[in-house]
Amino acid sequence: MTEARQTGDAMDVGLFGGSFNPPHIAHLIVADVVRDQFGLDEVWWIPNATPPHKEDDALAGVEHRLAMTRRAVDDHPSFRVCDIEVQRAGVSYTVETIRALQEQHPETDFGLIIGSDSLDHFGNWHRPDEIADRVPIIVYKRPGVIEEVAEPRFANRVHFVSAPVMEVSGTEIRARCR
């Protein structure tokens, strides 16, 4: 369940999913810039239990990634960790997460935060049209990726963020730690 404030007030929340293998400074900066530019009350970080696009052997254990993510956001009052994908068995599909969160939090307006690298293949995601119908898509630029909507059918649901481009990746961090 989401470790978020429990009030009767409507909220605007950004859903920031990822493997967070590990969470790093670029994730924190992006989440903060998105929260600020879009006037979000909170950003919910959602570590993927079993992402459909990554090999299991490249990932730290899900409980370890969840713990790292909690530590990373601990000092940020507008950031929360949502373990919905960790609690749900099987592959983590964004559309299922969005459906469940909208059902659990009907007064909350959600937006999906993704990198421009993910936007490039968003049309290949599981049920992308339903995702785009349910939530706006907030896109931050990733290094080396062109900032444009590959599929015009999603263009009116995509909003780009003016965020600093960070040359940091979990892959690079893991390689330096070996």
Sequence positions of predicted segments:
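Nucleotidyltransferase catalytic core that binds NTPs
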Residues: 1-178
